[in-house]
Every structure is written in C-alpha cells, then in structure tokens.
C-alpha cells in the first residue's frame, strides 16, 4: 500500500512520467509510465495505490512500451507476426504481453500475415531471381502459416516463373564456360533448382533454350582435351586414347566428337 506523492514529466520523453509512491515502512517507489497509462488509471497526487493496482499499472505500461517497440520495428518494412514475436522476446518482453500487443496490432491492421506474404511474394518476384520454392522456404522461416504461404504464391504465376527461369538461363549462356552442352545444361538445371524453380519449369526452359552449336561443342571439347591430354600423354597410344575417351565422355562430350578430335590429332601428328 502506498500513496502517490509526485508526478513529473521525464526529461527524455515528454510522453512519459515519473511516478513517486510513498510506502509505509518502506523506501519510496519511483517508476515511469506512459501518458496513456497515466490517463487510463487516472493517476494523481494523493492517490492510494495498493499492490494489485500497482501490478496492473506496471503490466499496462509494459504493454504500451512493447507496442511502441513493435511499431518502431514495423517502421522499416512489413513484418510477419512471428518476426514481431521474436523481436519482442529479444527485448525481454514476456509472451502474455506480446499476445496483447499482437491483438492490438491486428486490430489496427499493422500486422496481417496474408497481406505480408502476398507483398513479400510480389517483391521477390519483381526484384530478385528467386523461384517460388525458395520464396516459400523464406516465408516458412519468417513463421508464416503454410496455408497463407500457399495462397500468397498465387501472386507468382507459372508463366512468370518460366520467364524468370529463362532469364537466368540466358544469363548463364552468356557466361558459358568451355564445357559440353550436356555439362552446361546440367549446371544450369542445378542452378535453377537451387533458385527454387520446379522441375516442370526447368524442363520447359531447357527444352526451349538453344544449346551449343556443333562448332561450339567442338571448341569446348578442344579446350578440355588440351587440359586432359597432358595427364595421359606418357601412356602408349591405345591406353592414351582409352583414357581420353573416358575423361571427355565423363565431361559430357559425345563419342563421335571425341573420336573426331583423336583422328585430327593423328592427322596433325
């Protein structure tokens, strides 16, 4: 039991107030509360404060502070509910207070996992090279419910996925190494899978893509063969050819082109 003996504005924040409570046989209690809490409980000098009322005041102020922290966190970008929960927990806010804050944020439309997920998909679709499966995994890490994620991915149409995957294919083609068409297509396939595109989308893109010309395949084989031949040059001719065929075939070149290269080597030699 105690009595409020002083109420003053804090120097740091004009919306927070120092409350000094005189308690019998105990040292005075000094705490700060938000102006909304001050008004809610109609706090004033001379007011009697029992332990139950004090707990209610402290709890209400904890909600107000956590709410302000959540708003500041939301000021940078939209957030999922789970992001807000994790942020407030790191700030030391207890779960009952967090739930109170979330209820208020939902009511005021500051948080909405459906709107958040839909906006997230649109943003990633328009600003990144991610496929839907990668975006889905990111939304799962952000704590968005599976049913909400499924609905949000409608924002990323199948045709848009094909266009995005084809763009990655064309970029990879421009940066193509000296490799066989088979090795190139496998490398691009793995890249598109890591980016989160489905097998169906990848199959369409690779089928539509124009692979190596025959001359490009010969040039790539020549580059790889020149690297490998030094490794086997000391072998007798039959073993040398066997080793070269095996090594170049593993790199995706056809036996016909490999044998053609070996014949040219014989002619040059």
Curated annotation (Swiss-Prot):
It comes from the Bacteria. One of its GO terms (biological process) is regulation of DNA repair. It is found in: Cytoplasm. Keywords: Cytoplasm. It holds the Pfam family RecX_HTH2. Its main location: cytoplasm. Gene3D superfamilies: Winged helix-like DNA-binding domain superfamily/Winged helix DNA-binding domain. The keyword Cytoplasm applies. One of its GO terms (cellular component) is cytoplasm. InterPro entries: RecX_HTH_1st, RecX_HTH_2nd, RecX_HTH_3rd, Regulatory_RecX, WH-like_DNA-bd_sf. Modulates RecA activity. NCBIfam families: PRK14135.1. Belongs to the RecX family. HAMAP family: RecX. This is Regulatory protein RecX. The lineage of its organism: Bacteria, Bacillati, Bacillota, Bacilli, Bacillales.
């Amino acid at each position: 039991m105690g009595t409020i003996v002083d109420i003053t504005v804090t120097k740091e924040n004009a919306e927070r107030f120092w409350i000094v409570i005189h308690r019998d046989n105990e040292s005075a209690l000094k705490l700060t509360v938000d102006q909304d809490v001050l008004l809610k409980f109609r706090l004033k000098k001379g007011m009697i404060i029992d332990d139950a009322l004090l707990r209610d005041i402290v709890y209400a102020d904890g909600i107000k502070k956590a709410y302000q922290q959540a708003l500041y966190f939301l000021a940078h970008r939209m957030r999922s509910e789970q992001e807000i929960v994790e942020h407030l927990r790191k700030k030391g806010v207890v779960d009952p207070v967090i739930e109170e804050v979330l209820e208020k944020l939902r009511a005021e439309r500051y948080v909405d996992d459906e709107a958040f997920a839909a906006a997230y998909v649109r943003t990633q679709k328009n600003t990144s090279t991610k496929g839907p499966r990668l975006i889905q995994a990111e939304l799962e890490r952000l704590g968005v419910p599976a049913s909400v994620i499924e609905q949000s991915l409608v924002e990323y149409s199948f045709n848009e996925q094909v266009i995005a995957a084809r763009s990655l294919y064309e970029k990879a083609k421009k940066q193509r190494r000296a490799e066989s068409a088979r090795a190139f297509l496998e490398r691009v396939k793995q890249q598109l899978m890591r980016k989160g595109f489905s097998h169906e989308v990848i199959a369409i893109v690779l089928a539509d893509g124009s692979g190596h010309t025959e001359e490009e395949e010969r040039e790539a084989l020549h580059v790889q063969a020149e690297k490998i031949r030094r490794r086997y040059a000391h072998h007798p001719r039959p073993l040398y050819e066997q080793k070269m065929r095996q090594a170049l075939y593993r790199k995706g070149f056809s036996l016909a082109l490999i044998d053609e290269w070996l014949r040219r080597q014989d002619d040059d030699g």
